[in-house]
Amino acid sequence: MIYNFVIALYISAVHLAALFNKKVAKMVKGEKEAFAVLKKQIDPQAKYLWFHAASLGEFEQGRPLIEQIRKQYPQYKILQTFFSPSGYEVRKDYKGADVVCYLPLDSPRNVKKFIDLAHPYMAFFIKYEFWCNYLSELKRRNIPVYSVSSIFRPQQIFFRWYGGSYKNVLKCFDHLFVQNEESVRLLESIGVTRTTVVGDTRFDRVLEICSQAKELPLVESFKGNNRKTFVAGSSWAPDEDIFIPYFNEHPEMKLIIAPHVIDESHLREIIGKLKRPVVRYTQATEENVKQADCLIIDCFGLLSSIYRYGEISYVGGGFGVSIHNTLEAAVYGIPVIFGPNNYKFLEAQGLKACQGGFEIQGKEDFDRLMNKFLSDEACLHEAGKNAGDYVRNNAGALEKIMNTVSL
């Protein structure tokens, strides 16, 4: 089978890359250890529901479902697997799962060994996870498997003339819970009909996060009462080159930056661009934070709570590979600004359509938009309301999934 030949080449390439790349090395090491983790931690007498997410973003999409199932069906145990270190390293101690490990690559040998050890009762693959051998083996063993929050586009291989064998992979799913009607139409065009439009579980997730947002006294002290606060989340250098110059020239606003990469060189680079008083979160005190105009979040795990302190938000990545999570900001009822690389994200298109999210092409667009928000309180309020309403109006995917899955 061509797919297995490609997988074999891919595995060889990954092992070679691991010699030079620490992140890939972590992944390879984790995959090798996965079988030992399963042997040690899996209870042969228990029924496991297996959730697989490529990385952290996909995990957050599946998380509401995991936690609802735990609450409603406590008799089941949860196995959570990851493909990427960026997911595993952050959530390896996640209390909502009984076992957390990497997913070994999709070779026939790995697949058989993994499923033998894990013996899942049911499986849930989040968003873009379509591993041919895992799905085929689950179907062969009559283990129910669901696709959650998936979204499909005409450009994907399943809908190309040369994608014949890949089309059959989608037929291994007992049901696909998709984000939009276009996905249903595309799937129907290749004979996949067990589908339901439920939307995106991330809407449910960000509403839950919002209701449990951490109170951060240092951020509260930094914000004060006199000036509007601009929160830039998951920013990269091209993003920072747009909003930092504006901040430098506008003393009527404060700035919180939570960069995507928080290594020392990037933090120093950011500080070098700033022309106003700045403090790092890990070095902040009740005294010095009040004197700063910019607060740099140099640790992980706070961003989803920090957006609550802003009047305007910026979500980074849109001048690189793709934007990060816009819903984390929108849920707090504040306008969201982002760069042009957002076309693959349905929620970004929805935010733009409702005038709660705003795409910029560069610094001129950003400056014009910020001038409008800072000078027109009614415009700022309406944009924020639009963003918050968009999130609330699109929640409910979790309930639709729970009504369909039989446990």
Where are the regions that the model predicts?
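Active-site and donor-binding regions of nucleotide-sugar-utilizing enzymes
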Residues: 15, 19-212, 216-217, 231, ...
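Donor-nucleotide binding loops and adjacent catalytic segments primarily
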Residues: 68, 74, 81-82, 88, ...
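Acidic donor-binding loop of glycosyltransferase active sites
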Residues: 118-122, 290-321
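A short alpha->beta transition loop at the rim of the catalytic pocket in nucleotide-sugar-dependent
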Residues: 142, 311, 333
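Short alpha-helical segment that forms part of, or immediately flanks, the ligand-binding pocket
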Residues: 304, 327-332, 349
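A short, well-ordered alpha-helix in the C-terminal region of glycosyltransferases
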Residues: 379-393
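C-terminal alpha-helical cap of glycosyltransferases
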Residues: 394-407
